[in-house]
């Protein structure tokens, strides 16, 4: 007989042992289940469990925190893509960076496709590894923009770097652009740009062809320093002259360009582009290349997907260009002819409207306005007439009142060309500050609009100015797409405090302020801006001409936003980059590597 006291002790011991065994078994089961969920081997793993165990039903684990974050990111990205489709190019442009951030060189749509792949994958370790591998391969493909053109291979990787030297022989000066490209991708990726400019332009040398050619030497020295010596013999160099040399006449301009080609071929190691490599560039090419430059740097062209593009307005010294991609309504028919430009870039085709208005660059516009002022008073003035050779360094002896000069300001020794080889030199004086009908630029705006010749016959309606056909920007260009104005448009707004984004009406107000004179400048502008205005007495005329061209000439509404910049991502705007890209196609670039004489 067991003592009741001993019996209770035995029962208590058995109970404790049972409880301990239960907890030990539960903990072991929990560890096994956790290991099964987290470390479940793939089907092709050498450690696959026995079939019976593998067949046991296992509930799929809940989505991981990483998946939730990816799904949230995907939803946010889809929302952003929806907004981007509505606003086309996003927020206002800062002046030095693209208006939206691109991911791995592609549009956000590609990233969304990649995230969709990740979101729909199962939480199997092997599948996750495959997804990560696929995403890595896709990201690599995205960086290349399109299928890479592997020109030279090193351990299976393309590392081709090529250079282009482009010289812009403009009307007021010459500029060199030395571009460095990664040519392993299509379109080529711009890595860096070296830029230098000097004055005067080639056209100022007139018949001194040797002097004109040698004037480019400082620019070519920049190229020699930038391009590695082992690359120089296979680096193309081109010299493209614009309106200034075009206005010099065919005989004189050809003599200068022939001497430039000879100088490059004899004295420099670069591969000189044949045929039109050293030439006067056609105005339509100048505008289209400027359009390519801007939209290439903005990321609008070059990818597989066709994106909305920006309109481009370029203002040089001798001519101005307009280029945009019209979107015609159903009831509108594009006009064939010289204004229509069709070409292919990357995987997409573009049909552009373009026109180069020769004689309507800023310096030519100045001269046209000053012509009107002087012609009205020429009969009552005793002025000496000069030829183009004689006018250099000539001093004025007569003052002429000009409504395009601010009150109290004098533009000294202004050369006015009235006809072929007919020049006069005068001092242009601003009106009295008491004359409210003149001060403020109203009369100057009238003169600026008059030189645009809006009353000229328009044979193919609608027209912009001087009888030139132009599709309506209001009807055929999306109101949310960007309009970029650069070169002299930038040079006459940025130095006096204008932001990188402004309306035509704000430009008109700025023009009025500048024409009112220094008394008003000091109340509104910073000291540096006032200093800049004092250094250029014809700033009022320039702004009046620019405003008239954009609003009255091109018919851009007053409320329309414009964007201006000198560079995008530290790369110069203008036609040079657009003209350099085709030279990288070694099969069709019209140049061959030179034999390196140092070898």
From Swiss-Prot:
Biased composition of type Low complexity is found at 65-76, 120-133
Q: Which residues lie on this side of the membrane: Cytoplasmic?
A: 1-6
The question of whether Transmembrane helix is a record keyword is answered with yes
Q: Which InterPro entries is this protein grouped with?
A: GDA1_CD39_NTPase (IPR000407)
Q: Tell me the route in metabolism or biology where this protein functions.
A: Protein modification; protein glycosylation
Is Membrane one of the keywords? yes
Q: Which UniProt keywords apply?
A: Golgi apparatus, Hydrolase, Membrane, Signal-anchor, Transmembrane, Transmembrane helix
Ranges of Pro residues composition bias in the record: 47-64
The ranges of region (Disordered) come to: 41-105, 117-155
Output the Gene Ontology cellular-component terms.
Answer: Golgi apparatus; Golgi membrane; membrane
EC numbers: 3.6.1.42
The residues responsible for catalysis, as annotated, are 286
What is the membrane topology noted in the UniProt record heading this document? Answer: Single-pass type II membrane protein
Which residue ranges traverse the bilayer?
7-24
Its subcellular locations are: Golgi apparatus membrane
- Report the PANTHER family cross-referenced here: ADENOSINE/GUANOSINE DIPHOSPHATASE, GUANOSINE-DIPHOSPHATASE
The family line of this record is: Belongs to the GDA1/CD39 NTPase family.
Q: What is this protein called?
A: Guanosine-diphosphatase
* Gene source species: Candida albicans (strain SC5314 / ATCC MYA-2876) (Yeast)
The gene behind this protein is GDA1
């Amino acid at each position: 007989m067991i003592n009741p006291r001993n019996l209770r002790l035995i029962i208590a011991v058995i109970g404790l042992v049972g409880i301990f065994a239960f907890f030990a078994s539960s903990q072991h089961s929990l560890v096994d289940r956790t290991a099964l969920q987290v470390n479940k081997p793939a089907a092709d793993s050498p450690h696959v469990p026995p079939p019976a165990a593998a067949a046991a039903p296992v509930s799929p684990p809940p989505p991981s925190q990483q998946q939730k974050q990816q799904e949230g990111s995907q939803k946010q990205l889809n929302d952003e893509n929806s907004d981007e489709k509505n606003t086309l190019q996003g927020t206002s442009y800062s002046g030095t960076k693209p208006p939206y951030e691109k991911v791995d060189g592609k549009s956000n749509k590609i990233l969304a496709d990649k995230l969709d792949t990740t979101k729909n994958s199962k939480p199997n370790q092997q599948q996750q590894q495959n997804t990560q591998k696929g995403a890595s391969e896709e990201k690599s493909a995205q960086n290349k923009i399109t299928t890479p053109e592997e020109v030279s291979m090193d351990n299976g990787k393309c590392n081709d770097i090529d250079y282009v030297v482009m010289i812009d022989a403009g009307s007021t000066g010459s500029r060199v652009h030395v571009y460095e490209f990664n040519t392993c991708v299509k379109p080529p990726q711009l890595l860096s740009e070296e830029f230098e400019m000097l004055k005067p332009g080639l056209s100022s040398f007139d018949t001194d062809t040797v002097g004109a050619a040698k004037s480019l030497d400082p620019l070519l020295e920049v190229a020699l320093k930038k391009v590695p010596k082992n690359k120089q013999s296979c680096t193309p160099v081109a010299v493209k002259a614009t309106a200034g040399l075009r206005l010099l006449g065919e005989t004189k301009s050809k003599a200068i360009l022939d001497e430039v080609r000879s100088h490059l071929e004899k004295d420099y190691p670069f591969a000189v582009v044949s045929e039109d490599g050293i030439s006067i560039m056609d105005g339509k090419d100048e505008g289209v290349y400027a359009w390519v430059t801007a939209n290439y740097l903005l990321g609008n062209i070059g990818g597989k997907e066709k994106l909305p593009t920006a309109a481009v307005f370029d203002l040089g010294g001798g001519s101005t260009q307009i280029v945009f991609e019209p979107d015609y309504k159903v009831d509108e028919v594009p006009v064939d002819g010289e204004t229509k430009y069709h070409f292919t870039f990357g995987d997409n085709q573009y049909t552009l409207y373009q026109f180069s208005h020769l004689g309507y660059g800023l310096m030519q516009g100045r001269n046209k306005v000053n012509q009107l002022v002087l012609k009205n008073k020429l009969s009552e003035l005793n002025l000496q007439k000069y030829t183009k050779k004689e006018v250099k360094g000539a001093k004025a002896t007569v003052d002429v009142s000009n409504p395009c000069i601010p009150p109290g300001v004098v533009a000294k020794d202004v050369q006015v060309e009235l006809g072929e080889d007919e020049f006069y030199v005068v001092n242009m004086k601003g009106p009295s500050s008491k004359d409210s009908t003149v001060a403020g630029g109203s009369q100057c705006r009238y003169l600026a609009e008059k030189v645009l010749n809006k009353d000229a016959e328009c044979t193919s309606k609608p027209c912009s100015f001087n009888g030139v056909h132009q599709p309506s920007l209001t009807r055929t260009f999306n109101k949310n797409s960007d309009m970029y104005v650069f070169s002299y448009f930038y040079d006459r707004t940025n130095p006096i405090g204008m932001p990188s984004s402004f309306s035509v009406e704000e430009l008109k107000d700025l023009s009025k302020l500048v024409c009112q004179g220094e008394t008003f400048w000091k109340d509104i502008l910073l000291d540096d801006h006032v200093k800049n205005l004092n250094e250029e007495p014809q700033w009022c005329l320039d702004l009046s001409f620019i405003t008239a061209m954009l609003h009255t000439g091109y018919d851009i509404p007053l409320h329309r936003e414009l964007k201006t910049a000198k560079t995008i991502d530290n790369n110069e705007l203008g036609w040079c980059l657009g003209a350099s890209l085709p030279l990288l196609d070694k099969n069709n670039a019209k140049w061959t590597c030179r034999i390196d004489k140092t070898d």
